[in-house]
């Protein structure tokens, strides 16, 4: 047979076959400068493939093939050597089998734990009655009236929120949905978490370093009775991944422009059952039906960046009216160092994106202009490759994207 026929019959690439020849495993005769695979060479190839299936290395296979070629295993010494090689491989496999049996047992336990970890009855939540006092009309500031209510002693599940000035919103499955829906075409609700897929391990490690900083700062805070807000969760949602860091005696406001994203996360949070009182708010603006001066802490993981995808304004300036006089900010800002090509790609994909997005100078300047002072910050590192994923498709390989975590407060008198 010719090499092409051998390749097709045994499902091997020609490069593989040539490698075996160059390695000395196969020694086919030549006819007119072309290799011819006679019966003996084919037997050698089949033996090589059989030994490979037994996890022998090429050097071990070469030794076994050589023993057959030199002595045909007639010598007692060669027989003993071959038996020893088989016995050693058998012992090696027995160790692996024992190891894999233990691995299978551990995996079975993990699968069983996940299968049985579902709560017998999933807790269903709504708009907490304890947080109704945070709501007001965003147009005139008056209290909202509620009607057509489906509720119990703890939550409102459905209803209508109205004001005499004409403002109205609805409560749908516990989510407050305002008239400010998103009608753009450059984004969509990420219900299957495409943003998380195909992130390279190096970037995930960078995320974790920033998470660690934010968790360290949270450990120093007493959030009992405090109101914590996080916006733009369709991109990244810090609170969801770190619910164990938050007090069930606090109050939490979660905002996104997509009701679908809020419904998805609400269902997950109900399954996880950390019993955090959460007001879910669907609104694509920053004119929320919230009282001024009600927020103690704002969480930001990419939210400031995400806001600038669609607005030329600075998110913390827009949220400023909702902060208490002693309000705090905790987050992670993403910025480029000389990211000219990445920003060109970003601005081409998102026509409404601010040209100041991903700029550390812009972030520091606008944070101060909004009346906030950064108490601490930590540059957690940078990546030059965000991988092939939806979340950072605009990031050009080679350009440095940094993550800076920060903690700050609203300056008195501002």
Residue ranges and their predicted role:
Residues 40-117:
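Arg/Lys-rich, alpha-helical DNA-contact motif
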């Amino acid at each position: 047979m010719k090499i092409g026929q051998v390749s097709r019959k045994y499902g091997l690439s020609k490069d593989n076959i040539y490698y075996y020849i160059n390695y000395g495993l196969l020694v086919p005769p030549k006819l007119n400068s072309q290799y011819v695979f006679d019966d003996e060479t084919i037997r050698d190839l089949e033996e090589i493939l059989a030994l490979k299936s037994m996890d022998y290395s090429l050097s071990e296979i070469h030794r076994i093939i050589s023993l057959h070629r030199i002595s045909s295993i007639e010598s007692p010494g060669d027989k003993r050597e071959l038996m020893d090689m088989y016995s050693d491989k058998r012992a090696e496999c027995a160790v692996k089998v024992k190891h894999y049996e233990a691995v299978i047992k551990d995996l079975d336990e993990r699968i069983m734990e996940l299968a049985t970890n579902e709560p017998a009855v999933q807790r269903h939540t709504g708009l907490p009655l304890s947080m109704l006092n945070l709501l007001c009309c965003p147009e005139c500031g008056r209290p909202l009236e509620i009607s057509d209510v489906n509720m119990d002693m703890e939550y409102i599940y459905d209803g209508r929120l109205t004001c005499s000035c004409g403002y109205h919103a609805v409560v749908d499955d516990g989510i407050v949905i305002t008239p400010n829906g998103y009608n753009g075409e450059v984004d969509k609700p990420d219900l299957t978490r495409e943003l998380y897929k195909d992130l390279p391990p190096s970037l995930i490690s960078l995320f974790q370093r920033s998470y660690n900083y934010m968790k360290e700062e949270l450990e120093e805070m007493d959030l009992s009775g405090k109101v914590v807000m996080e916006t733009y969760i369709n991109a990244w949602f810090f609170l969801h991944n770190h619910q164990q860091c938050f007090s069930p005696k606090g109050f939490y406001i979660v905002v996104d422009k997509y009701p679908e994203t809020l419904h998805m996360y609400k269902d997950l949070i109900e399954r996880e059952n950390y019993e955090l009182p959460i007001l879910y708010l669907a609104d694509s603006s920053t004119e929320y039906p919230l009282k001024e001066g009600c927020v103690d802490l704002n969480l930001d993981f990419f939210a400031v960046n995400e806001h600038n995808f669609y607005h030329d304004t600075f998110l913390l300036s827009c949220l400023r009216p909702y902060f208490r006089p002693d309000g705090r900010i905790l987050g992670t800002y993403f910025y480029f160092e000389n990211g000219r090509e990445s920003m060109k790609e970003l601005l081409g994909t998102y026509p409404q994106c601010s040209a100041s997005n991903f700029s550390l100078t812009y972030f520091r300047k606008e944070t101060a202009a909004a009346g906030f002072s950064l108490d601490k910050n930590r540059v957690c590192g940078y990546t030059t490759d965000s991988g092939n994923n939806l979340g950072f498709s605009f990031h050009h390989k080679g350009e440095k994207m940094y993550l800076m975590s920060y903690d700050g407060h609203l300056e008195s008198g501002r």
